[in-house]
UniProtKB/Swiss-Prot annotation:
Topology of the protein relative to the lipid bilayer: Multi-pass membrane protein
UniProt name for this protein: Phospholipid phosphatase-related protein type 5
The species this protein was found in: Homo sapiens (Human)
Domain of life: Eukaryota
Subcellular location: Cell membrane
């Protein structure tokens, strides 16, 4: 027996909640457990790429994790809620009901207002992308085990015991380090940069939201300034990681690519550039019309047209003669 539309919608909602819960759990295991073993990468004796001074714990950074995570989680929520509320109120004030989404039935008994539905949809996709970015970054750090620029300052290798008579001698193995194991493990997880990826993901998602949603007059200059300001903050976050010797340039660039790719994919392919359901249905309808086969109907000439054609030929012949 086929599922009713309401039951199918309810089933898909539960399925999406399971996917979201699984994504959050996977990010938790990557972030706070030792389930995934970090690849132990070796190094050359006195390698200048890893001899930078230790900049201190992450909390002493110019962009501490608490500040970064708070902004990445709070600013998009505030902007999207304010933006959707403003758009909804503007449509009510101008009585633009054609472009406004309709109230639909969700599940068996729940009627969802379009304002609530759009806000939850966009924030839910953003939250999913935030955890997905964290998973991508942690997976890359675990697999590569790339060393931080200040790795040797934390590793504190005993060069005499290791026999580092030449700079070209390669050292491998965890026993080569004598420093704090927890700090050493963190120094092995730098590629790609998590701070760069999360900051540029939040900035890119918000930039595309502002560009595609805010259509008010007089915002031709305000929108670019706001969007470029968000991207500039993300760019400065990556530069700060390099300036404080916490990441290499390659780590930051890779983090930028991960964050931008996930944001663009979710906005373009999942939320359809923040368009409403009505616009999506119209687009699908036009695509279906374009794909329909063209049927050619033969033209039937009427007797009156035949008589008119004969008279025209006779008149033309008389004029020539």
């Amino acid at each position: 027996m086929p599922l009713l539309p309401a039951a199918l919608t309810s089933s898909m909602l539960y399925f999406q909640m399971v996917i979201m819960a699984g994504t959050v759990m996977l990010a938790y295991y990557f972030e706070y457990t030792d389930t995934f073993t970090v690849n132990v990468q070796g190094f050359f004796c006195h390698d200048s790429a890893y001899r930078k001074p230790y900049p201190g714990p992450e909390d002493s950074s110019a962009v501490p994790p608490v500040l970064l995570y708070s902004l990445a989680a709070g600013v998009p929520v505030l902007v999207i809620i304010v933006g959707e509320t403003a758009v909804f109120c503007l449509q009510l004030a101008t009585r633009d009901f054609e472009n406004q989404e309709k109230t639909i039935l969700t599940g068996d008994c729940c009627y969802i207002n379009p304002l609530v539905r759009r806000t939850v949809r966009f924030l839910g996709i953003y939250t999913f992308g935030l955890f997905a970015t964290d998973i991508f970054v942690n997976a890359g750090q675990v697999v590569t085990g790339n060393l931080a620029p200040h790795f040797l300052a934390l590793c504190k290798p005993n060069y005499t015991a290791l026999g580092c008579q030449q700079y070209t001698q390669f050292i491998s193995g965890e026993e080569a380090c004598t420093g704090n194991p927890d700090l050493i493990m963190r120094a092995r997880k730098t590629f790609p940069s998590k701070e760069a990826a999360l900051s540029v993901y939040a900035a890119m998602y918000l930039t595309m939201y502002i560009t595609n949603t805010i259509k008010a007059k007089g915002t031709r200059l305000a929108k670019p300034v706001l969007c470029l300001g968000l991207m500039c903050l993300a760019f400065l976050t990556g530069l700060n990681r390099v300036a404080e010797y916490r990441n290499h340039w390659s780590d930051v660039i890779a983090g930028f690519l991960v964050g931008i790719s996930i944001a663009v994919f979710l906005v373009v392919c999942v939320v359809n550039n923040f368009k409403g359901r009505q616009a999506e249905n119209e687009h699908i309808h036009m695509d279906n019309l374009a794909q329909m086969p063209m049927i050619s109907i033969p033209r039937v000439e009427s007797p009156l047209e035949k008589v008119t054609s004969v008279q025209n030929h006779i008149t033309a012949f008389a004029e020539v003669t």
